[in-house]
């Protein structure tokens, strides 16, 4: 937990850093104290997103930031399978930002450097295949032939599945409060750059979660009951952090 949390000291002043730590304890609670992997993933995901924002949106030309993102990407991709999805989302956001702003060729060295961060996880996956190291939870996806037309049709076009997923998301108080906090912060600060950046990353991850829930070969209710409270931690912390960042940036400008 400490490397990304040390970075938060540089992000905020003393008062706002304490506010961030309070938010962190409220969102992660036991995950932070015990050191559960999902809390670790949420922290690395949030600060990787923040550094990407600083480098490619705020145009901070800092190799220090770039190298930290590179290390965070490697750690994130090796922690859990969700981390791989997060890294791919952030890399996609980097591509979209640079192509839309016509800065791709200007930043191509940075992009290539960050792309190389997925090499360790690729090597690890190759080793797993060569030594027949399998994950039983992933193998059942293959055994159940989840990508068959009938399976996908029954799950993806089932309105009850969407309703159930939405219900579990809504019932997570911390997640709803984080969205409200982000919206309130945007209403008062009008910081479109921070708001749209964080919203695009958060929604991309939530969309990927919905897809995974829809194609799960397990009972959907059981899957949601056992996983939502853990995996929703990452977008919750992301929205809360960027909501606080909007307010902090506004207060700094006023002063």
Task: Describe the predicted segments one by one.
Residues 14-25, 68-71, 192-219:
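Transmembrane alpha-helix segments characteristic
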Residues 1-55, 65-76:
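Membrane-embedded helix bundles of polyisoprenyl
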Residues 28, 36, 67-96, 118-126:
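Transmembrane helices and adjacent periplasmic/lumenal helix-loop junctions
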Residues 9-17, 58-64, 99-112, 184-203:
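Membrane-interface helix-loop-helix junctions at transmembrane boundaries of multi-pass membrane enzymes
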Residues 41, 76, 80, 120-124, ...:
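Alpha-helical transmembrane segments of multipass membrane proteins
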Residues 28-30, 99-100, 125-132, 210-221:
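Juxtamembrane "helix-exit" motif on the non-cytosolic side of transmembrane helices
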Residues 96-97, 107-187, 202, 206-207:
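Membrane-lumen/periplasm interface segments of specific transmembrane helices
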Residues 38-44, 79, 85-86, 222-247:
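Hydrophobic/aromatic-rich transmembrane helices and adjacent perimembrane loops
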């Amino acid at each position: 937990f400490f490397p990304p949390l040390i970075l938060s000291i540089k992000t905020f002043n003393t008062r706002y850093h304490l506010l961030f730590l309070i938010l962190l304890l409220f969102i992660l609670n036991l995950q932070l104290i015990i050191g559960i992997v999902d809390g670790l993933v949420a922290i690395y995901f949030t600060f990787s997103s923040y550094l990407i924002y600083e480098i490619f949106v705020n145009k901070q030309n800092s190799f220090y930031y770039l190298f930290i993102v590179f290390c965070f990407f490697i750690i994130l991709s090796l922690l859990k399978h969700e981390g791989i999805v997060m890294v791919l989302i952030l890399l996609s956001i980097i591509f979209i930002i640079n192509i839309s702003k016509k800065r791709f060729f200007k930043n191509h060295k940075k992009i290539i450097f960050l792309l190389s961060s997925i090499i360790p996880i690729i090597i690890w996956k190759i080793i797993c295949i060569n030594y027949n190291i399998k994950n039983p939870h992933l193998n059942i996806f293959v055994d159940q032939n989840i990508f068959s037309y009938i399976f996908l049709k029954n799950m993806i076009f089932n309105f009850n599945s969407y309703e159930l997923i939405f219900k579990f998301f809504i019932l997570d108080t911390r997640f709803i409060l984080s969205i409200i906090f982000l919206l309130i912060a945007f209403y008062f600060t009008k910081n479109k750059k921070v708001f749209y950046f964080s919203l695009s990353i958060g929604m991309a991850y939530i969309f990927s979660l919905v897809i995974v829930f829809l194609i799960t070969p397990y009972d959907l209710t059981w899957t949601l009951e056992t996983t939502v409270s853990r995996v929703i931690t990452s977008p919750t912390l992301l929205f809360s952090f960027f909501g606080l960042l909007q307010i902090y940036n506004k207060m700094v400008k006023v002063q």
